[in-house]
Swiss-Prot record:
Entry-linked PROSITE patterns: RESPONSE_REGULATORY (PS50110), SIGMA54_INTERACT_1 (PS00675), SIGMA54_INTERACT_2 (PS00676), SIGMA54_INTERACT_3 (PS00688), SIGMA54_INTERACT_4 (PS50045)
UniProt KW keywords: Activator, ATP-binding, Bacterial flagellum biogenesis, Cytoplasm, DNA-binding, Nucleotide-binding, Phosphoprotein, Transcription, Transcription regulation, Two-component regulatory system
Domain Response regulatory: 2-114
Gene name as annotated: flbD
MF (Gene Ontology): ATP binding; ATP hydrolysis activity; sequence-specific DNA binding
Domain named Sigma-54 factor interaction: residues: 120-349
Location(s), subcellular: Cytoplasm
Protein name per Swiss-Prot or TrEMBL: Transcriptional regulatory protein FlbD
Pfam family, one: HTH_8
DNA-binding region, residue intervals: 416-435
Further remark: FldB is transcribed during a very brief time in the cell cycle just before the periodic expression of FlbG and its other target genes.
GO biological processes: bacterial-type flagellum organization; phosphorelay signal transduction system; regulation of DNA-templated transcription
Organism: Caulobacter vibrioides (strain ATCC 19089 / CIP 103742 / CB 15)
Record function comment: Activation of sigma-54-dependent flagellar gene promoters and strong negative autoregulatory effects on its own promoter. The synthesis and function of FlbD in C.crescentus is controlled by an internal cell-cycle clock.
GO cellular component assignments: cytoplasm
Length: 455
């Protein structure tokens, strides 16, 4: 982790720097906020800024963001003046570290803010095969395309590959191609010279140069404009880039990783992605299975997130109840690991008893998780779905959806909660669908007695 310290290195701040270095940080130093912005602009990469709270933190953050240099900031200061600490947080600092420093606090803050040491939590055989392949190709210089649904952990996998590579001690730089406007992405990747365009007040080093010697991750590369893909292809082939407004090519030594949640082969057919670029990137493909295809990972991930967020919130770590585990495994998790992480974060905060009960685990819409269906009910619903699928040819999507919901509900004996769980939708969504069908005159199976059966 690269730490840029901003402020005068005297007394307690110097001690804090030594503690950060002992915690594994690679530390560099400037005295003023202007020097900090200039250092970032010149390509001195940083994962975190530690800034003395007597300096203009708001101005520093504004100056950096004006040039799209979004590096998290933690404030620090002697005597822990409450007003100054509050103002630093209000200005945009993620955390405040009081000085004299505490070694454990500094290590915890560095880990929490940068969050770049996410381990690979793997128990399921499907994911173990992916890890095995990643371990094989990580030491090479091959470009790797990491594919999978949104939230399945593609960036975590990219960091894992970098950590296992021969470039592990060099920078890992990530660019989200979907989050940066098309007209700015070229400058973000390749940098620009002073005066290259309106607002280019100074030379800016791009991500390719910042990653020199290390790894560059092109996140969601499928969202990149076709015109820019041509320039990217040349940079990958020639290992040199042209800054916007520059006259001389710049050599770079990097390894390229890329991620996508779209089918790039189909994008090639649609004309939105270059076939030659796909071949360059897809030397090795690591496909991350969605969470629903690796159920053995669910509880291990849950326990990891409980530990993480209990520590982050100063809450005693609790075990997960047996019923909660059953529901967690049965849920389909359309948002994958990201959705599961958010659910467990909420559960840590909402749990009131000695265990994390099933009622503390809430879905994104605030609804509790549905009970796990018993085997007989699940098998009956599957048979209903199989039988229905044979009659779906020639029907509209809405008609297919309606028939599937009605058939599943019938085989769940009217139990709304069980049916919603099998269908992979929330109970609220199911009830809204059933009301819509009833209003249209469709016969809806009545609810039966028992927990979760009420309409």
């Amino acid at each position: 982790m690269r730490l840029l310290v901003v402020g005068k290195l005297n007394g307690q701040l110097s001690v804090a720097v030594k503690m950060a270095m002992n915690a594994g940080a690679k530390v560099s130093h400037v005295e003023t906020t202007e020097q900090a912005t200039n250092a970032l602009r010149a390509g001195q990469g940083a994962d975190l800024l530690m800034v003395d709270y007597v300096l203009d933190i708001a101005g520093l953050i504004a100056a950096n963001e004006a040039e799209r240099m979004r590096v998290p900031v933690v404030a620090c200061g002697v005597d822990a003046d409450p007003m100054r600490a509050a103002n630093a947080i209000k200005a945009g600092a993620k955390e405040f570290i009081p000085l004299p420093p505490d070694a454990e606090l500094i290590a915890a803050v560095l880990a929490a803010v940068t969050d770049d040491e996410k381990p690979m939590v793997v128990r399921d055989p499907a994911m173990e095969q992916v890890i095995k392949l990643a371990d094989q190709v990580a030491p090479s210089e091959a470009s790797i395309l990491i594919t999978g649904e949104s939230g399945s952990g593609k960036e975590v996998m990219a960091r894992y590959v970098h950590g296992k590579s021969r470039r592990a001690k060099a920078p890992f730089i990530s660019v989200n191609c979907a989050a940066i406007p098309e007209n700015l992405l070229e400058s973000e990747l390749f940098g620009h010279e002073k005066g290259a365009f309106t607002g280019a007040m100074a030379r800016r080093i791009g991500k390719f140069e910042e990653a020199d010697g290390g790894t560059l991750l092109l996140d969601e590369i499928s969202e990149m404009d076709v015109r820019l893909q041509a320039k990217l292809l040349r940079a990958i082939q020639e290992r040199e880039i042209d800054r916007v407004g520059g006259s001389k090519p710049v050599k770079v030594n990097i390894r390229i990783l890329a991620t996508s949640n779209r089918d790039l082969a189909q994008a090639v057919k649609d004309g939105t992605f270059r076939e030659d670029l796909l071949y360059r990137l897809n030397v090795v493909n690591l496909r991350l299975p969605p969470l629903r295809e690796r159920p053995a990972d669910v509880i291990s991930l849950c326990e990891f997130f409980v530990k993480k967020y209990s520590a982050a919130n100063g809450i005693e770590e609790k075990p997960i109840s047996a019923e909660a585990k059953r529901r967690l495994i049965a849920h389909r998790w359309p948002g994958n690991v990201r959705e599961l992480e958010n659910a467990m974060h909420r559960a840590v905060l909402l749990s009131a008893g000695p265990e994390i009960e099933e009622f503390a685990i809430r879905l994104p819409d605030g609804q509790p998780m549905a009970p796990a269906p018993d085997v007989a009910v699940a098998r009956g619903a599957q048979m209903a779905a199989d039988a229905a699928s044979r009659a779906f040819v020639g029907s509209t999507v809405a008609e297919v959806e309606q028939q599937l919901i009605i058939d599943t509900l019938e085989h769940c004996l009217g139990n709304r909660t069980h049916a919603a769980n099998i269908l992979g939708i929330s109970i609220r969504t199911l009830r809204n669908k059933l009301k819509e069908y009833s209003d249209a005159g469709v016969q809806v199976p009545p609810p039966q007695g028992g927990v979760g059966a009420a309409a």
